[in-house]
Each structure stands twice: as structure tokens, then as C-alpha cells.
Amino acid sequence: MRLISALLLSLICVQLSVAQNIQQLLYEGAPVIHGAQVTGNYPNTDFLFTVPATGERPIQFAAENLPEGLNLDGTTGIIKGVVKKSGTYPVKITAINAKGKTVQMLLIEIGDNLALTPPMGWNSWNVFTKYIDEKMLIEMADAMVSSGMRDLGYQYLNIDDYWHDVARDSATGKPVVDPKKFPNGMRYVADYVHSKGLKLGIYSDAGTMTCGKCFGGYTYEEIDAKTYSEWGIDLLKYDFCHVPLKKSEALSRYKKMGDALKGSGRSIVYSVCNWGFFGPWKWVPELGGNYWRTTPDIFDLWKGAGIWQMSVMNILKRSHGLEKYAGSGQWNDPDMLLVGNYGKGHATSANGRFKGLTDTEYFSHMAIWAMMASPLLSSCDLRSMNEATKAILMNETLLRINQDKLGKQASRVSKKDNVWTYKKDLHHGGVALAFLNTSNSTKQVNIDWKNYTDMSNFKIISATEGQLTVTENRTVNLAPHQTLVFELSATK
């Protein structure tokens, strides 16, 4: 996919619009299987996984050694069913088209753990806030497929606040959706999303009300979890508004919902959103959470703002040192991606005060989030992405680094001359490196690869240039706020 890398380089460096279409580039040539090489699910619950693959269509998919209870649709690459027996199941996936064939192993873990790699998908909050409805969500699901995002591993479509009716069902206490926004109900949306090989997420709050003052989940945890299961929900983001700001309250309330989700009869990924208070990285995994917010909300800013309006650099500074808490099924969450909003997001622009990042800064934002093994949740309008946004969100090298099954979060290993260097170990014994220029002036960096790897023979893939010729060192010029990312892996 060197063409895409070259296109991205032109987009982020010279900031020109181009006529080439990312989707066309993704669907040329022999099949390539992307995304996670491992996925988890609870036993006796619905399983859904789409083999993420690009290449010329049609592609015919096949699977060897699927666990009993699962079936693969050979045309769509969607695997679904129910597995009763816990265990580790290595599955051989084959994809064939007119241009060639590829084989990839997929490890299916049926047991107690979900989100074995960082969740990838989309969330409604940054761009839409309360302006959500059934029609828009269905269009967003279609856009995730038609853009090529699903075929690169994006799978969650997450509804944030404001899906609620004015009150719960007075007789049963069950949550009720706003009938004007969702005339066919939430199950209808879930069924549609699932038919596309995607998963549906929803939002609630550990308090009596959500941050938007809709009804919260406090004291209704079991009712809500079972209702979400009936609706076909696959992920819950659980906020912390209208709650006494005490650690004991956080632990108690998040545990109740964690227990309720575990007993819901469905594999529901649990996102804890208490903005980093009380060090959630230390206790969320014990309560059943899969990822946790490390800071207050992100805004469309490179740097500056205050404690409740975090910029990319604010969040990045707070992330250093948290890497030891990240791993398979438990991830630090530095909040959603800003990429593609350009100051137009209803939430992230702060009502138009913040004008957004440059494409160079959006790429750096995406690159460092990928290196940090963060959940990658886009929150722009997928229906109207420009080519730069598509190229950034669908950068195959960054996504591969993020989804690496070793599950390591990058560490900052240098901050010399305002160039921050990050290193992330990868499952094949290689490393990913990122060089971020945090200053407002161009920096020249001399990279000696031997400082970062013990491998004697290796290849180098640049996230913006494709495969490079290996030399002992490489000198690069980094523009202000620019990031370059390299993946090093052993050669035979």
C-alpha cells in the first residue's frame, strides 16, 4: 500500500487536496488482512467478528478450525455464532481474490476477557453532542463500511449522551430511548449495525443523571445491563457526572455496573469514564473495566486551555508513566480522536472558540495515540471526511502498531531538544518508534536505528513513506508539531 503512504505524505506535509480516492487504493490488488490477530468473547454469548481485509473485490473468505458454534460467511468475512466452551482457538483465515491469496492466523479467546486489543471505532460526542438520531447512526454505519474503515479494523459505532427519553419506564424502571430520535427503537439500530459486521456501543452515567442531565444508571445497574443485552449492545461508556467526588463512590458504583454487565448474558466491553480521578488505572481492571479515561475531555486544541478543556499536549504529558498499567484487555484511554473536525465539532470546538488542528497536528495526534495502545475512536462526521482525514484515520502502519497483539503501550525514551521519542515493543520482536517535534520551529533529527533495537537484520516501514532502504542512520527534518513513525521488524 505504498501509494497510500505517498498520498498521506503529500497531504500532511504540503497540505494540498488531491483527486486520488483512498477507497480506490484500498480495494486494489491482492487481499491483505488487517486489524487484531486476537479477539475475546465470553462463553455462551453472541460472538461477532469481521475479518478486516482490503484488496480487489470480490474476496472469498475461508476459515479452518473455527470453534464449534461459529460460522464464517465466505462472502462478507463475518464470523458469528455462540461458543459454549471456554478455550483458546487458533483459526486459520484465508482470503482469495483474482489478484492473489493471503493467510492470517486469528486467535479466538473464549473466556473472561474482552477488548484484547484497543477498541477501534467511532463515537458521536465530539462532533454531534445531542444532535443524534437513528437515521444519522445508520448513515454512519454505512460510511464506516463504504469508506474502508471497517476493512481496516474499525468496528464499534458508539452512541454517547442524549439517546434517552425524558424518563425511565415507570412500571419496570427500564431505560427508554427517545422515540422521536429512535422511532424504531435501539434494537433496530443494533440489528442494522450488526448486519454490517459492526458493533454498537451506548452511554450512561454512574450518577442519578448523565452529564447532559438525562437519567443515569445509579441504582438501576442490573436493569440497565440486562436491557442493554436485550438491545444487542456491545460496549458501554459509563460516565461520572452527578456523583460525589470520592474514591469510595467511584469504586462502589463502577463495580456495581461491572458486575451487572458480566451477568447480563452478553459480551459488553466496559469503558470507565471518570476523567482520571483517583488513578483508575490501578483499580478499574479489578472491577471488570476494559479501558479508562486518564483525563478530562479533549478539545480541538494542540496545546493550552484548562483542566476541563484538555488539549492534545495536555493529555500527552499526563500519559507518561501510565504505560505499565496497559495490556491485553485493559487500556489507558486519553479520549477520542479529534481528526477531521477542524474546529467544527459541537463539543470539541467549545461553541466555535477553538478552530481545530492542522493536518500535520492531526496526524501527530493519531500517531501518538496509536503508539500509546489507546482506543482509537474517531469522532468526526464519517459521511463527509476529506482525503486527508481518511488518509490519517486509515493509515495501515499506525493501525497495525496500535493493534499489535503484544499489547504494549509506548514509553517516552527521550525529550532531547524538544523532540519527544517514543518506543513501543511489538509481538514479532520488533519495535515501533515515533519522533514528535513539540516545538514551534523545524528540528533536524539524526536517527541511529541501533540505539533502539538489537536486531542485526531488519526492515523499516515508515508510516508516511512505506518501506525504506535500511541504512545505519537516517537524518530527518521535523516541521513544528510533526511526527514521524517507523516500524522495525526482523528479516530472515
Where are these regions (language model features)?
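Glycan-recognition surfaces
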Residues: 220-223, 269-380
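Proline/serine/threonine-rich low-complexity linkers at boundaries of modular beta-sandwich domains
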Residues: 20-31
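Carbohydrate-binding surface patches
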Residues: 363, 369-372, 377-379, 415-454
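Aromatic-lined carbohydrate-binding/catalytic grooves of carbohydrate-active enzymes
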Residues: 126, 139-140, 144-247
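Strand-loop-strand motifs at the edges of beta-sheets in extracellular beta-sandwich domains
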Residues: 69-85
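Solvent-exposed, low-complexity, repeat-rich "mucin-like" stalks and linkers
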Residues: 31-56
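C-terminal beta-strand-rich structural cap/linker in extracellular carbohydrate-active enzymes
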Residues: 470-492
